From Swiss-Prot:
Record keywords: 4Fe-4S, Iron, Iron-sulfur, Isoprene biosynthesis, Metal-binding, Oxidoreductase
Reactions the enzyme catalyzes: isopentenyl diphosphate + 2 oxidized [2Fe-2S]-[ferredoxin] + H2O = (2E)-4-hydroxy-3-methylbut-2-enyl diphosphate + 2 reduced [2Fe-2S]-[ferredoxin] + 2 H(+); dimethylallyl diphosphate + 2 oxidized [2Fe-2S]-[ferredoxin] + H2O = (2E)-4-hydroxy-3-methylbut-2-enyl diphosphate + 2 reduced [2Fe-2S]-[ferredoxin] + 2 H(+)
Residues noted as binding dimethylallyl diphosphate in the record, renumbered to the chain: 41, 74, 124, 225-227, 269
Positions bound to isopentenyl diphosphate: 41, 74, 124, 225-227, 269
Alphabetized GO MF terms: 4 iron, 4 sulfur cluster binding; 4-hydroxy-3-methylbut-2-enyl diphosphate reductase activity; metal ion binding
Listed name of the protein: 4-hydroxy-3-methylbut-2-enyl diphosphate reductase
Domain of life of the organism encoding this protein: Bacteria
CDD domains hit by this protein: lytB_ispH (cd13944)
Names of the cofactor(s): [4Fe-4S] cluster
Residues involved in [4Fe-4S] cluster binding: 12, 96, 197
Functional description taken from the UniProt entry: Catalyzes the conversion of 1-hydroxy-2-methyl-2-(E)-butenyl 4-diphosphate (HMBPP) into a mixture of isopentenyl diphosphate (IPP) and dimethylallyl diphosphate (DMAPP). Acts in the terminal step of the DOXP/MEP pathway for isoprenoid precursor biosynthesis.
Pathway(s): Isoprenoid biosynthesis; dimethylallyl diphosphate biosynthesis; dimethylallyl diphosphate from (2E)-4-hydroxy-3-methylbutenyl diphosphate: step 1/1; Isoprenoid biosynthesis; isopentenyl diphosphate biosynthesis via DXP pathway; isopentenyl diphosphate from 1-deoxy-D-xylulose 5-phosphate: step 6/6
Protein backbone atom coordinates (compact mmCIF):
# COMPACT_ATOMS: atom_id res chain seq x y z
CA UNK A 1 0.00 0.00 0.00
CA UNK A 2 1.38 3.37 -1.05
CA UNK A 3 1.00 6.35 1.30
CA UNK A 4 0.79 9.83 -0.21
CA UNK A 5 0.83 13.08 1.76
CA UNK A 6 -0.98 16.22 0.62
CA UNK A 7 1.08 19.38 0.50
CA UNK A 8 0.39 21.77 2.14
CA UNK A 9 -1.47 20.27 5.09
CA UNK A 10 -1.92 20.99 8.78
CA UNK A 11 -1.33 24.18 10.73
CA UNK A 12 -1.86 27.55 9.08
CA UNK A 13 -0.38 30.84 10.27
CA UNK A 14 -3.54 31.90 12.10
CA UNK A 15 -3.76 28.64 14.06
CA UNK A 16 -0.05 28.70 14.86
CA UNK A 17 -0.41 32.25 16.20
CA UNK A 18 -3.51 31.46 18.28
CA UNK A 19 -1.92 28.45 19.95
CA UNK A 20 1.27 30.42 20.62
CA UNK A 21 -0.77 33.18 22.29
CA UNK A 22 -2.29 30.70 24.75
CA UNK A 23 1.00 28.87 25.34
CA UNK A 24 2.93 32.10 25.88
CA UNK A 25 0.26 33.46 28.22
CA UNK A 26 0.50 30.28 30.29
CA UNK A 27 4.29 30.58 30.36
CA UNK A 28 4.29 34.26 31.35
CA UNK A 29 1.32 34.44 33.70
CA UNK A 30 0.76 30.85 34.80
CA UNK A 31 -2.54 29.01 35.07
CA UNK A 32 -5.38 29.56 34.88
CA UNK A 33 -5.78 31.33 31.55
CA UNK A 34 -9.37 31.66 30.29
CA UNK A 35 -10.10 31.18 26.59
CA UNK A 36 -13.45 32.07 25.06
CA UNK A 37 -14.42 29.07 22.95
CA UNK A 38 -11.93 26.43 21.81
CA UNK A 39 -8.92 28.44 20.65
CA UNK A 40 -8.87 26.29 17.49
CA UNK A 41 -11.16 23.42 16.54
CA UNK A 42 -8.93 20.47 17.33
CA UNK A 43 -9.47 18.06 20.20
CA UNK A 44 -5.77 17.20 20.66
CA UNK A 45 -4.73 20.86 20.80
CA UNK A 46 -7.51 21.83 23.20
CA UNK A 47 -6.85 18.87 25.51
CA UNK A 48 -3.12 19.66 25.54
CA UNK A 49 -3.74 23.30 26.49
CA UNK A 50 -6.33 22.30 29.08
CA UNK A 51 -3.72 20.08 30.77
CA UNK A 52 -1.43 23.11 31.01
CA UNK A 53 -4.09 25.19 32.72
CA UNK A 54 -6.21 26.76 29.98
CA UNK A 55 -9.90 26.95 30.86
CA UNK A 56 -12.24 27.07 27.88
CA UNK A 57 -15.49 28.97 28.43
CA UNK A 58 -18.37 30.22 26.28
CA UNK A 59 -19.69 33.12 28.37
CA UNK A 60 -17.66 36.08 29.64
CA UNK A 61 -19.64 35.79 32.89
CA UNK A 62 -17.74 32.56 33.59
CA UNK A 63 -14.46 34.49 33.87
CA UNK A 64 -13.59 35.80 37.36
CA UNK A 65 -12.64 39.45 37.86
CA UNK A 66 -8.97 40.21 37.31
CA UNK A 67 -8.39 37.11 35.18
CA UNK A 68 -6.67 36.80 31.81
CA UNK A 69 -8.98 36.15 28.86
CA UNK A 70 -8.07 35.16 25.31
CA UNK A 71 -10.44 35.35 22.34
CA UNK A 72 -10.22 32.31 20.04
CA UNK A 73 -8.90 32.32 16.47
CA UNK A 74 -12.49 32.46 15.18
CA UNK A 75 -13.08 35.99 16.47
CA UNK A 76 -15.87 37.47 18.57
CA UNK A 77 -18.72 39.93 18.11
CA UNK A 78 -18.51 43.56 19.21
CA UNK A 79 -20.98 42.72 21.98
CA UNK A 80 -18.62 40.10 23.42
CA UNK A 81 -15.66 42.43 23.05
CA UNK A 82 -17.54 45.23 24.85
CA UNK A 83 -18.64 42.89 27.63
CA UNK A 84 -15.04 41.84 28.22
CA UNK A 85 -13.94 45.48 28.16
CA UNK A 86 -16.48 46.34 30.86
CA UNK A 87 -14.89 43.82 33.22
CA UNK A 88 -11.57 44.01 35.07
CA UNK A 89 -9.94 41.55 32.67
CA UNK A 90 -6.63 41.40 30.85
CA UNK A 91 -7.63 40.51 27.28
CA UNK A 92 -5.49 39.10 24.48
CA UNK A 93 -6.96 38.63 21.02
CA UNK A 94 -6.06 35.45 19.12
CA UNK A 95 -8.47 36.22 16.27
CA UNK A 96 -6.86 35.23 12.98
CA UNK A 97 -5.79 38.41 11.13
CA UNK A 98 -7.60 37.13 8.03
CA UNK A 99 -10.84 36.90 10.03
CA UNK A 100 -10.19 40.40 11.38
CA UNK A 101 -9.96 41.59 7.77
CA UNK A 102 -13.51 40.35 7.16
CA UNK A 103 -14.65 41.99 10.42
CA UNK A 104 -13.31 45.30 9.12
CA UNK A 105 -15.21 44.89 5.84
CA UNK A 106 -18.47 44.36 7.76
CA UNK A 107 -17.81 47.27 10.14
CA UNK A 108 -17.07 49.54 7.17
CA UNK A 109 -20.35 48.57 5.48
CA UNK A 110 -22.20 49.13 8.75
CA UNK A 111 -20.79 52.65 9.13
CA UNK A 112 -21.80 53.48 5.56
CA UNK A 113 -25.33 52.19 6.08
CA UNK A 114 -24.88 49.52 3.43
CA UNK A 115 -26.57 46.17 3.85
CA UNK A 116 -24.25 43.17 4.03
CA UNK A 117 -24.57 39.51 3.18
CA UNK A 118 -22.26 36.95 4.74
CA UNK A 119 -21.74 33.60 3.03
CA UNK A 120 -21.15 31.11 5.82
CA UNK A 121 -22.39 28.27 8.01
CA UNK A 122 -25.01 29.14 10.62
CA UNK A 123 -23.86 28.51 14.17
CA UNK A 124 -20.14 28.57 13.43
CA UNK A 125 -18.31 30.86 15.89
CA UNK A 126 -16.54 32.72 13.08
CA UNK A 127 -19.91 33.51 11.52
CA UNK A 128 -21.35 34.67 14.85
CA UNK A 129 -18.36 36.94 15.40
CA UNK A 130 -18.49 38.37 11.89
CA UNK A 131 -22.25 38.98 11.93
CA UNK A 132 -21.73 40.71 15.26
CA UNK A 133 -19.62 43.47 13.68
CA UNK A 134 -22.73 44.98 12.07
CA UNK A 135 -24.75 47.39 14.23
CA UNK A 136 -26.59 49.78 11.91
CA UNK A 137 -30.38 49.42 12.37
CA UNK A 138 -30.97 51.41 9.17
CA UNK A 139 -29.29 48.67 7.15
CA UNK A 140 -29.22 44.92 7.57
CA UNK A 141 -26.91 41.92 7.91
CA UNK A 142 -27.93 38.62 6.32
CA UNK A 143 -26.52 35.09 6.26
CA UNK A 144 -26.72 32.73 3.29
CA UNK A 145 -25.26 29.25 2.84
CA UNK A 146 -26.45 28.23 -0.62
CA UNK A 147 -27.78 29.55 -3.95
CA UNK A 148 -31.24 28.54 -2.71
CA UNK A 149 -30.85 30.89 0.26
CA UNK A 150 -30.00 33.70 -2.14
CA UNK A 151 -33.19 33.16 -4.14
CA UNK A 152 -35.29 33.52 -0.96
CA UNK A 153 -33.40 36.53 0.43
CA UNK A 154 -35.18 39.88 0.68
CA UNK A 155 -33.11 43.02 1.33
CA UNK A 156 -34.14 46.64 1.94
CA UNK A 157 -32.04 48.33 -0.75
CA UNK A 158 -30.22 46.24 -3.33
CA UNK A 159 -28.46 49.34 -4.67
CA UNK A 160 -26.31 49.51 -1.51
CA UNK A 161 -25.36 45.94 -0.88
CA UNK A 162 -22.08 44.10 -0.25
CA UNK A 163 -21.05 40.52 0.52
CA UNK A 164 -18.34 38.82 2.54
CA UNK A 165 -17.44 35.17 3.14
CA UNK A 166 -16.44 32.96 6.03
CA UNK A 167 -12.74 32.13 5.67
CA UNK A 168 -13.03 28.32 5.78
CA UNK A 169 -15.63 27.53 3.12
CA UNK A 170 -15.53 25.26 0.09
CA UNK A 171 -14.03 27.29 -2.74
CA UNK A 172 -16.34 25.66 -5.31
CA UNK A 173 -19.52 26.04 -3.25
CA UNK A 174 -18.73 29.65 -2.44
CA UNK A 175 -18.20 30.45 -6.10
CA UNK A 176 -21.71 29.12 -6.83
CA UNK A 177 -23.22 31.30 -4.08
CA UNK A 178 -21.35 34.39 -5.31
CA UNK A 179 -22.63 33.74 -8.85
CA UNK A 180 -26.17 33.53 -7.46
CA UNK A 181 -25.71 36.79 -5.53
CA UNK A 182 -24.44 38.64 -8.60
CA UNK A 183 -27.34 37.30 -10.68
CA UNK A 184 -29.96 38.27 -8.08
CA UNK A 185 -28.38 41.59 -7.08
CA UNK A 186 -26.42 42.99 -10.07
CA UNK A 187 -25.16 46.02 -8.09
CA UNK A 188 -23.76 43.98 -5.20
CA UNK A 189 -20.16 44.73 -4.27
CA UNK A 190 -17.70 42.17 -2.94
CA UNK A 191 -14.06 42.07 -1.91
CA UNK A 192 -11.49 42.14 -4.71
CA UNK A 193 -10.79 38.53 -3.84
CA UNK A 194 -13.21 36.42 -1.84
CA UNK A 195 -12.46 36.15 1.86
CA UNK A 196 -11.64 32.43 1.86
CA UNK A 197 -8.16 32.33 3.34
CA UNK A 198 -4.99 31.22 1.60
CA UNK A 199 -4.66 28.12 3.81
CA UNK A 200 -8.20 26.91 3.09
CA UNK A 201 -7.71 27.42 -0.64
CA UNK A 202 -4.29 25.75 -0.69
CA UNK A 203 -5.45 22.72 1.32
CA UNK A 204 -8.47 22.21 -0.92
CA UNK A 205 -6.23 22.42 -3.98
CA UNK A 206 -3.85 19.90 -2.36
CA UNK A 207 -6.56 17.40 -1.43
CA UNK A 208 -7.89 17.59 -4.98
CA UNK A 209 -4.44 16.55 -6.27
CA UNK A 210 -4.27 13.85 -3.60
CA UNK A 211 -7.68 12.40 -4.46
CA UNK A 212 -6.70 12.12 -8.12
CA UNK A 213 -4.10 9.51 -7.13
CA UNK A 214 -5.40 7.89 -3.93
CA UNK A 215 -8.09 5.23 -3.54
CA UNK A 216 -8.83 6.31 0.02
CA UNK A 217 -8.29 9.72 1.62
CA UNK A 218 -7.83 10.24 5.37
CA UNK A 219 -8.34 13.79 6.63
CA UNK A 220 -6.88 14.45 10.07
CA UNK A 221 -9.12 16.95 11.84
CA UNK A 222 -11.85 17.25 14.43
CA UNK A 223 -15.55 16.96 13.63
CA UNK A 224 -16.19 20.62 14.52
CA UNK A 225 -13.45 21.90 12.20
CA UNK A 226 -15.07 23.61 9.22
CA UNK A 227 -12.03 23.51 6.96
CA UNK A 228 -11.34 19.83 7.77
CA UNK A 229 -14.92 18.88 6.88
CA UNK A 230 -14.59 20.68 3.56
CA UNK A 231 -11.47 18.63 2.72
CA UNK A 232 -13.27 15.33 3.33
CA UNK A 233 -16.30 16.50 1.33
CA UNK A 234 -14.12 17.52 -1.61
CA UNK A 235 -12.44 14.10 -1.78
CA UNK A 236 -15.85 12.41 -1.56
CA UNK A 237 -17.17 14.56 -4.40
CA UNK A 238 -14.28 13.28 -6.49
CA UNK A 239 -15.62 9.77 -5.97
CA UNK A 240 -13.12 8.63 -3.36
CA UNK A 241 -13.76 7.08 0.03
CA UNK A 242 -12.77 9.82 2.47
CA UNK A 243 -12.80 9.78 6.26
CA UNK A 244 -12.44 12.59 8.79
CA UNK A 245 -10.45 11.28 11.76
CA UNK A 246 -9.28 12.86 15.01
CA UNK A 247 -6.26 10.58 15.26
CA UNK A 248 -4.78 7.24 14.24
CA UNK A 249 -7.02 5.30 16.62
CA UNK A 250 -10.03 6.17 14.43
CA UNK A 251 -8.65 4.27 11.43
CA UNK A 252 -10.58 1.10 10.62
CA UNK A 253 -8.55 -1.61 8.90
CA UNK A 254 -11.45 -2.33 6.55
CA UNK A 255 -11.12 1.18 5.09
CA UNK A 256 -7.65 0.54 3.70
CA UNK A 257 -7.17 -3.22 3.41
CA UNK A 258 -7.93 -3.30 -0.33
CA UNK A 259 -6.45 0.12 -1.17
CA UNK A 260 -3.40 0.34 -3.40
CA UNK A 261 -2.87 3.97 -2.40
CA UNK A 262 -3.99 5.88 0.70
CA UNK A 263 -3.78 9.66 0.79
CA UNK A 264 -3.36 11.61 4.01
CA UNK A 265 -3.99 15.28 4.65
CA UNK A 266 -4.79 17.43 7.68
CA UNK A 267 -6.99 20.42 8.36
CA UNK A 268 -5.50 23.79 9.26
CA UNK A 269 -5.98 23.18 12.99
CA UNK A 270 -4.46 19.68 13.13
CA UNK A 271 -0.87 19.34 14.44
CA UNK A 272 1.71 17.34 12.52
CA UNK A 273 2.18 14.82 15.33
CA UNK A 274 -1.28 13.47 14.53
CA UNK A 275 -0.32 13.03 10.87
CA UNK A 276 2.86 11.19 11.87
CA UNK A 277 0.82 8.87 14.09
CA UNK A 278 -1.54 8.16 11.18
CA UNK A 279 1.42 7.31 8.95
CA UNK A 280 2.77 4.93 11.61
CA UNK A 281 -0.62 3.21 11.87
CA UNK A 282 -0.91 2.85 8.09
CA UNK A 283 2.57 1.32 7.98
CA UNK A 284 1.49 -1.19 10.63
CA UNK A 285 -1.33 -2.07 8.24
CA UNK A 286 1.07 -2.70 5.36
CA UNK A 287 1.85 0.78 4.07
CA UNK A 288 5.22 1.78 2.68
CA UNK A 289 7.18 4.98 3.14
CA UNK A 290 5.05 8.13 3.08
CA UNK A 291 5.66 10.19 -0.05
CA UNK A 292 4.79 13.93 0.01
CA UNK A 293 3.25 15.38 -3.14
CA UNK A 294 4.46 18.66 -4.57
CA UNK A 295 2.38 21.67 -3.61
CA UNK A 296 2.31 25.34 -2.79
CA UNK A 297 4.92 26.57 -0.35
CA UNK A 298 3.54 28.62 2.55
CA UNK A 299 5.75 31.20 4.24
CA UNK A 300 3.15 33.37 5.96
CA UNK A 301 3.74 34.13 9.64
CA UNK A 302 1.45 36.13 11.94
CA UNK A 303 3.20 37.64 14.96
CA UNK A 304 1.84 37.23 18.48
CA UNK A 305 1.09 40.44 20.44
CA UNK A 306 4.29 42.06 21.66
CA UNK A 307 3.19 41.64 25.29
CA UNK A 308 3.30 37.88 24.78
CA UNK A 309 6.55 37.54 22.87
CA UNK A 310 8.65 35.47 25.18
CA UNK A 311 11.92 33.61 25.15
CA UNK A 312 10.99 30.61 27.28
CA UNK A 313 14.58 30.47 28.56
CA UNK A 314 14.00 33.85 30.24
CA UNK A 315 11.22 32.50 32.43
CA UNK A 316 12.69 29.13 33.36
Amino acid sequence: MQILLANPRGFCAGVDRAISIVENALTLYGAPIYVRHEVVHNRYVVDSLRKRGAIFIEQISEVPDGAILIFSAHGVSQAVRNEAKSRDLTVFDATCPLVTKVHMEVARASRRGEESILIGHAGHPEVEGTMGQYNNPQGGMYLVESPEDVLKLEVKNDARLSFMTQTTLSVDDTSDVIDALRARFPKIVGPRKDDICYATTNRQEAVRALAEQADVVLVVGSKNSSNSNRLAELAQRMGKAAYLIDDASDIQEAWVKDAACVGVTAGASAPDILVQNVITRLQELGGGEAVPLEGREENIVFEVPKELRVDVREVE
